[in-house]
Amino acid sequence: MSDPTQKIAVLGAGSWGTALAALVARHGHPTVLWGRDAAMVDAIDRTHENPRYLPGIALPDSLRATTDLQQTIAGASWILVVVPSHAFTETIKLLAPLRPAGAGIAWATKGFEPGSGRFLHEVARDILGPSVPLAVVTGPSFAKEVTLGLPTAITVHGDDAAFAQVVADAMHGPTFRAYTGDDMVGAELGGAMKNVLAVATGVADGMQLGLNARAGLITRGLNEMLRLAAVIGARPETLMGLAGLGDLVLTCTGDLSRNRRLGLALGRGQSLSDAIREIGQVVESVQTADEVMRQAEQHGIELPISNAVRAVLHGEITPEAGLKELLARERKPEYPQTLFT
């Protein structure tokens, strides 16, 4: 059961950071939300609304917001990082010297470290040292629906079972189910790859290729997740659960997904720059596609859908050419016999 006396610090005042801060605040936890944009943070603190990312949705009166990182973290029982993947390393470095003794670090960031392609738990462990409890929060969850109190299920995977349970308990409530696990590699892989695959289904829908094409891309996309999972030490059941299949289905079919919307725009003939400008928020797939293919090349495996997305995002091929290449590939058994062994 969650301890309501725990102070929780949430770093990142975008849509997902705000939604999770509001969630734990509603469950009775003293919660402070940190952001860099002074005007937006002030609006959250005074009016209890995030006018940029969650307009018109009331946030708990008890939720505080500030641009002062030290004030946010001071006295926190644990810290939740919810920033884009390109800001993750910097944020962990900023919080490291301010972290109260014993406070674990969780994050709801999805993606890899840009440039290195490292998993985020590897980045956090290198910066924070061997003794700090770590956990990743992931699964099929749109910020708007969580903030509105609509039913949601996520999972918390950590290298410290007790800390993962603390995080899950703080989030779990009448309309929000939080499960736990210990496969951080699988949990982070699913959360990253689904963004790339959502672009593929968005492109197909933008080109009006039909529901059969969408279902085929989702299923073969899951195959690519499992193929990469098998060579990097992730467990297949993690990818068949909320962290993989669940998040994949949501992101590939729900128009609240920024990555799906990017694909829709590209499939309708829009340029990448125009599509990103229209979305107006960070679209993780643009960076993540490169890192997914870096992992694939390191391990000598083929990920044709992910590679096609990467090529389209770099302007190397058109969506039409990418589709033609995928349809022309040599047929193989649906699943290699070794995939689940």
From Swiss-Prot:
Belongs to the NAD-dependent glycerol-3-phosphate dehydrogenase family. Pathway: Membrane lipid metabolism; glycerophospholipid metabolism. One of its GO terms (cellular component) is cytosol. PANTHER family: GLYCEROL-3-PHOSPHATE DEHYDROGENASE, GLYCEROL-3-PHOSPHATE DEHYDROGENASE [NAD(+)] 2, CHLOROPLASTIC. One of its GO terms (biological process) is glycerol-3-phosphate catabolic process. It comes from the Bacteria. This is Glycerol-3-phosphate dehydrogenase [NAD(P)+]. It comes from Xanthomonas campestris pv. campestris (strain ATCC 33913 / DSM 3586 / NCPPB 528 / LMG 568 / P 25). Catalyzes the reduction of the glycolytic intermediate dihydroxyacetone phosphate (DHAP) to sn-glycerol 3-phosphate (G3P), the key precursor for phospholipid synthesis. It catalyses: sn-glycerol 3-phosphate + NAD(+) = dihydroxyacetone phosphate + NADH + H(+); sn-glycerol 3-phosphate + NADP(+) = dihydroxyacetone phosphate + NADPH + H(+). The active site is at 194 (proton acceptor). Its EC number is 1.1.1.94. Keywords: Cytoplasm, Lipid biosynthesis, Lipid metabolism, NAD, NADP, Nucleotide-binding, Oxidoreductase, Phospholipid biosynthesis, Phospholipid metabolism. Sn-glycerol 3-phosphate binds at residues 110, 139, 141, 194, 247, 257-259. Its main location: cytoplasm. HAMAP family: NAD_Glyc3P_dehydrog. The keyword Lipid metabolism applies. It is found in: Cytoplasm. The keyword NAD applies. It holds the Pfam family NAD_Gly3P_dh_N. NADPH binds at residues 15-16, 36, 110, 143, 258, 282, 284. It is an enzyme of class 1 (oxidoreductase). One of its GO terms (molecular function) is glycerol-3-phosphate dehydrogenase [NAD(P)+] activity.
